[in-house]
Curated annotation (Swiss-Prot):
The keyword Protein biosynthesis applies. It comes from Orientia tsutsugamushi (strain Ikeda). It catalyses: tRNA(Glu) + L-glutamate + ATP = L-glutamyl-tRNA(Glu) + AMP + diphosphate. Disulfide bonds: none annotated. PANTHER family: GLUTAMATE--TRNA LIGASE, GLUTAMATE--TRNA LIGASE, MITOCHONDRIAL-RELATED. Monomer. Its EC number is 6.1.1.17. The gene is gltX2. One of its GO terms (biological process) is glutamyl-tRNA aminoacylation. It is found in: Cytoplasm. This is Glutamate--tRNA ligase 2.
C-alpha cells in the first residue's frame, strides 16, 4: 500500500463528541498501522460559530485520548485565498460560473417544486450564460461562484465500507464554491485542503456520503486523484435512534469528568464498528497492530453504557497503583489541601480501593477514608450499627490494636478473629462496627487492610470517637 496519509478535520463549533472521537481514532490507527501519517486540520472557516474555547477543547480531548497527530495543526482559515484561487481556475476553465440568482429567487423555485410535489434541484439560468454574467460581474452585482456539476450520467463511489455507491448526476446540484462575501464554502475548502495535504484515505461518518459524490465530481473537474473513501455508520443511542444529548453524555470532556480512563474510552470506541475475532479488551498498542479498514462493519453501532462502564472498571483494576493514586490525588486536591501523609495513605490503599470502583470519581470518593483532612461522613446504615454497638466492645478492640507489636494485615486478622471467638461473635458482627467507625460506611476494602494503612494513631482515634458519634446522632 502507498504511503498512507489520513486526517481528522473537526469544526470548532462545539466540543469533541464521541462520534468525532471514534472517527479520529480510526484515522489515527489506520495511519499508524501502515506507518503513515495522521494529520489534524481545524476547519475554522465558520467565524460566527467557531470559538477558541471549542478549538482548545478539541485539541485537549485528542491529547487526553492519546490520539497524537503528525506535523503542525493545519488551520483551514489560513488557506482561504488558495481556496478562492482554485474556484477562479475552475471558472477560467469553464467548470464553474458566476451566478447572480438571488436567494429569494431560489426560495421561490423551491416553493414551486414543493407545491408540485417534486424534488428540488436548483438549476441556475447563469450556468451557460457566460457573456451576461461577466457583464454583471463588471458592474459589481452580487454573485456567488457555482460548480458546473455534471448533469448526465453517474458518479460512482467505490467505498471500502459501503461498497459501490452510484449517484445519478441529474440529482446533484451546482453547489456554491464561493459565497457572495468572497469566502469559500466547506465543499470547496475540504477538497482543496485534502489534495494539498496529500490525504490518501478519508474515514468519516456515512452522513457524508452524499457530499462525497459532489466532492468526487469536483476532484474530476480539477484533474486531481480523489482519496479513497471509507464511510462508517454513525453511532446510535441504546434505543436505536440517532445519538443526541437526551441519551446522556456525548462529549469526550464529559466522560473525562465522569471518571473514565482514556484507554477504556478508546477501547470501547474501537469496538463500535470495528472488530477483530472475539477480542473485547484491546490495548492502544495492540489496536495499532491489528487495526485495518477491512475490519469495519456496515451496520450501525449502538452505545452500551453498561459495557463502557465495565471496560472502565477493567482498566482501573489493570492500571498501576501509582498512576491511579496520582489521578485520584489530582481529583481530591480540588476539595482538600492534602498532606504528604494523606497522599501516602492513598497510595498504600490503592490495591484495596480499585477493586471496588468502575469510575475514577468513585475511586476518589472511596479514597476519602485515607484523607486525614476529611471529616468522615456516616451513611445512615453505619450510624445505626454504631448506635447499637457497646462502647466497651470498641474499647477492647482499641486495646488489641495498641498492643500489637507488628501492625499488618495478618496480625490484625489473627487478633480480631481470636477476639471474636472469645466474645462468641461471628467475625462479620465484629467487623461491621469497626468498618462503620473507620470508614463511615458499610462497604469498604478489607478492614484487615484499612487498619494497618491508617496506622495505630489514626485508627485508634477514629474508633475512640464512638461516644461522640453516638451523642451527636441521637
Amino acid at each position: 500500500m502507498t504511503n498512507i496519509v489520513t486526517r481528522f478535520a473537526p469544526s470548532p463549533t462545539g466540543f469533541l463528541h464521541i462520534g468525532g472521537a471514534r472517527t479520529a481514532l480510526f484515522n489515527y490507527l489506520f495511519a499508524r498501522h501502515h506507518k503513515g501519517k495522521f494529520l489534524l486540520r481545524i476547519e475554522d472557516t465558520d467565524a460566527a460559530r467557531s470559538t477558541e474555547e471549542y478549538k482548545l477543547g478539541i485539541i485537549d480531548s485528542l491529547k487526553w485520548l492519546k490520539i497524537n497527530w503528525d506535523n503542525d495543526i493545519f488551520y483551514q482559515s489560513a488557506n482561504l485565498q488558495r481556496h478562492v484561487n482554485v474556484a477562479l481556475e475552475l471558472v477560467k476553465s469553464g467548470k464553474a460560473y458566476y451566478c447572480f440568482t438571488s436567494q429569494e429567487e431560489i426560495d421561490l423555485q423551491r416553493q414551486l417544486a414543493i407545491a408540485q410535489k417534486q424534488s428540488f434541484i436548483f438549476r441556475s439560468p447563469w450556468r451557460n450564460n457566460i457573456p451576461s454574467s461577466l457583464s454583471l460581474k463588471n458592474n459589481n452585482k452580487a454573485y456567488v461562484i457555482r460548480f458546473k456539476a455534471p448533469n448526465h450520467g453517474t458518479t460512482i463511489i467505490n467505498d471500502y465500507v459501503q461498497g459501490k455507491v452510484v449517484f445519478q448526476n441529474q440529482q446533484i446540484d451546482d453547489m456554491i464554491l464561493v459565497r457572495s462575501d468572497g469566502t469559500p464554502t466547506y465543499m470547496l475548502a475540504v477538497v482543496v485542503d485534502d489534495h494539498d495535504m496529500g490525504i490518501t484515505h478519508i474515514i468519516r461518518g456515512d452522513d457524508h456520503l452524499t457530499n462525497a459524490a459532489k466532492q468526487i465530481a469536483l476532484y474530476d473537474a480539477l484533474g486531481w486523484k480523489a482519496p479513497a473513501m471509507v464511510h462508517i455508520p454513525l453511532i446510535y443511542g441504546p434505543d436505536g435512534t440517532k445519538l443526541s444529548k437526551r441519551h446522556g453524555a456525548i462529549g469526550v470532556d464529559a466522560y473525562q469528568k465522569m471518571g473514565y480512563l482514556p484507554e477504556a474510552l478508546c477501547n470501547y470506541l474501537l469496538r463500535l464498528g470495528w472488530s477483530y475475532q472475539d477480542e473485547e479488551i484491546i490495548s492502544h498498542e495492540r489496536a495499532i497492530k491489528l487495526f485495518d479498514i477491512d475490519g469495519l462493519g456496515k451496520s450501525a453501532a449502538r452505545l452500551d453504557f453498561d459495557k463502557m462502564l465495565y471496560l472502565n472498571g477493567y482498566y482501573i483494576r489493570s492500571t498501576d497503583n501509582s498512576i491511579l493514586a496520582k489521578l485520584v490525588i489530582e481529583i481530591l486536591s480540588k476539595q482538600y489541601i492534602l498532606s504528604n501523609e494523606s497522599c501516602n495513605l492513598i497510595q498504600k490503599g490503592m490495591s484495596g480501593l480499585k477493586s471496588r470502583a468502575n469510575l475514577l470519581t468513585d475511586l476518589a470518593e472511596n479514597a476519602k477514608i485515607y484523607v486525614l483532612e476529611n471529616q468522615l461522613t456516616f451513611v445512615n446504615e453505619a450510624l445505626n450499627i454504631i448506635q447499637k454497638t457497646p462502647s466497651m466492645l470498641i474499647t477492647e478492640v482499641i486495646d488489641i490494636i495498641n498492643n500489637l507489636q507488628e501492625l499488618n494485615c495478618e496480625s490484625v486478622k489473627q487478633s480480631l478473629t481470636e477476639f471474636a471467638k472469645v466474645k462468641h461473635m461471628k467475625l462479620g458482627q465484629l467487623m461491621d462496627p469497626i468498618r462503620a467507625l473507620l470508614t463511615g460506611n458499610t462497604k469498604s476494602p478489607s478492614i484487615f487492610e484499612v487498619i494497618p494503612i491508617l496506622g495505630k494513631i489514626h485508627a485508634v482515634k477514629r474508633l475512640a470517637d464512638i461516644e461522640a458519634i453516638k451523642s451527636n446522632n441521637q
